[in-house]
């Protein structure tokens, strides 16, 4: 979990994904369309990916474990959570507050 914690705080917006996950792709696209440039960690391409995926599942309990989205170093949630925050307008506010976007 320490590696996940370190990576999650490396940038204002961080997304843990898998390259074959359609919801991960959707969340990445949403962030790009909002003007954010998140750090993307594709767990299926990282040698420590399976361990990080297990840690994400253990700590946050979402199944599947990806996408796992962090803003300002804090866990925001999975795709369902992020979409809900986007619909109610709070995702953009989170991104602004963490300096992931400026407008």
Swiss-Prot record:
Coiled-coil intervals: none
Protein name: Putative glutaredoxin-C12
PROSITE patterns linked to this entry: GLUTAREDOXIN_2
Pfam families: Glutaredoxin
Organism classification: Eukaryota, Viridiplantae, Streptophyta, Embryophyta, Tracheophyta
Gene of this entry: GRXC12
A cellular-component GO term for this protein: cytoplasm
Keywords: Cytoplasm, Disulfide bond, Electron transport, Redox-active center, Transport
Main location group: cytoplasm
Domain spans labelled Glutaredoxin: 1-102
Protein family: Belongs to the glutaredoxin family. CC-type subfamily.
Native organism: Arabidopsis thaliana
GO biological process: negative regulation of transcription by RNA polymerase II
Stated role: Has a glutathione-disulfide oxidoreductase activity in the presence of NADPH and glutathione reductase. Reduces low molecular weight disulfides and proteins.
Subcellular location per the Swiss-Prot or TrEMBL entry: Cytoplasm
Intrachain S-S bonds: 21-24
């Amino acid at each position: 979990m320490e590696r996940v914690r370190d990576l999650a705080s490396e940038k204002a917006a961080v997304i843990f994904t898998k390259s074959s996950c359609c919801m991960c792709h959707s969340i990445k696209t949403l962030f790009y369309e909002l003007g954010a440039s998140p750090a993307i960690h594709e767990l299926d391409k990282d040698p420590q990916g399976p361990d990080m995926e297990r840690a994400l599942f253990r700590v946050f309990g979402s199944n599947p474990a990806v996408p796992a989205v962090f803003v300002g170093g804090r866990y925001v949630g999975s795709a369902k959570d992020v979409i809900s925050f986007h619909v109610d307008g709070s995702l953009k506010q989170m991104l602004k507050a963490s300096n992931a976007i400026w407008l």
